Amino acid sequence: MSTETHDEPSGVAHTPASGLRGRPWPTLLAVAVGVMMVALDSTIVAIANPAIQQDLHASLADVQWITNGYLLALAVSLITAGKLGDRFGHRQTFLVGVAGFAVTSAAIGLSGSVAAIVVFRVLQGLFGALMQPSALGLLRVTFPPGKLNMAIGIWSGVVGASTAAGPIIGGLLVQHVGWEAVFFINVPVGLAALVAGLVILTDARAERAPKSFDVSGIVLLSGAMFCLVWGLIKAPAWGWGDLRTLGFLAAAVLAFAGFTLRESRATEPLMPLAMFRSVPLSAGTVLMVLMAFSFIGGLFFVTFYLQNVHGMSPVESGVHLLPLTGMMIVGAPVSGIVISRFGPGGPLVVGMLLTAASLWGMSTLEADSGMGITSLWFVLLGLGLAPVMVGTTDVIVSNAPAELAGVAGGLQQSAMQVGGSLGTAVLGVLMASRVGDVFPDKWAEANLPRVGPREAAAIEDAAEVGAVPPAGTLPGRHAGTLSEVVHSSFISGMGLAFTVAGAVALVAAAVALFTRKAEPDERAPEEFPVPASTAGRG
């Protein structure tokens, strides 16, 4: 009987493969099932929020905390969670994350108050953070370098498919079962991932991984990420010049500065700054931020365009996004093969150029644009993003030493979170500014009668998301004209947002020129110093 063998990453110790345990492809299956649960949750919950608001008589702020509490917990703890995997083993960390995510999902479904839901959503975010870096860490230490891209490609395809399925599955569950089912669905998926993980995954950790925790570094980094992400989340509502926004962003800068100073002096740092002496790793991190800025920030407006301008239901809008996600699902494994053969640089540059072209194409959409042209830009965007998601992840993870595989996975996920939050906030401000500039002129050109300042402000606010408010004091005969003014104002703002997103994607294409995959013998141990307390262990 043949035995599967491959070159293991240097400095990694794990239990020898036996049966299914420790085999690369079964490991990918087990990891993918767990990550599928997190990816599905990232889009499915948004569909349930209106039903939760109505059923529990929640305020808009309460519902926002259901989403923001999860996002904050996730963003704050990703790198620390990756460090836990490096220290205690990625298998154990992943399984704790899976079990905790499933249990908190069940608790949310059983909750009878918004406060309880928010608490469990925060816990859910913490457990989700345990899973994602550990998943990449397990792939890094299980797959040989020549097949890692393919594994990441399939993993990315699963994430894309689950994300795409979220609105469709969520809409069906909310409509036919209830909002609780959106969370209960994680329980059987979590049990499947837990059983698969217990049977298949093997303990894997780097022999040279530090044995202590940089508590000061954890506190400073967590505080910096919290202030940064929260400031970006609230900036559109508070205003960029508001003292609260400036205060949180200033606190983030100070905390990051303190974290950098701490890491430069720590014996066993949370995230060794020497990692960033690797130009490809640094470029990959910047590229991930820029990609998320343009993609997530731009995609934020697509939902409003489909639902508020074209009048689609959440399920229908999810279906119309399938050309985008379908190309990502198909393209991710193919991209893994191409990158394995030719390296990441070329595919990443081409991918970001396609992304820029598709975003600029979407900037030309009008209120009456057909779904054919919209789908064309979605297909092009999916083809562009597929190699970027795979290649950037591989560049970051493969250029970090094996003992920091979890930290590298957390860095990759954190870069995406920060980029997405920054893109949504900045493009949202540009969108609102453009709508505010063109709305009065379009109102006057349409010869609509004057309304009171409060009603005019409410209509303009609705126009920022393409929603047509009730006519209010306007005579009913003006309803059609009001709709045209609102939609044309929204389209103008969306066009500017997509234009800027495309420009950022073009900058990302230039950054991609500095990326490459690390060779197995290229990274000398002294480039990433090992603490004296752990040197020589093994």
Curated annotation (Swiss-Prot):
It is a multi-pass membrane protein. GO terms for molecular function: transmembrane transporter activity. The keyword Membrane applies. It comes from the Bacteria. Its main location: membrane. SUPFAM superfamilies: MFS general substrate transporter. Disulfide bonds: none annotated. Pathway: Antibiotic biosynthesis; tetracenomycin C biosynthesis. The chain crosses the membrane at residues 28-48, 65-85, 100-120, 126-146, 154-174, 181-201, 213-233, 239-259, 286-306, 319-339, 342-362, 371-391, 413-433, 494-514. NCBIfam families: efflux_EmrB, MFS_efflux_tcmA. Belongs to the major facilitator superfamily. EmrB family. This is Tetracenomycin C resistance and export protein.
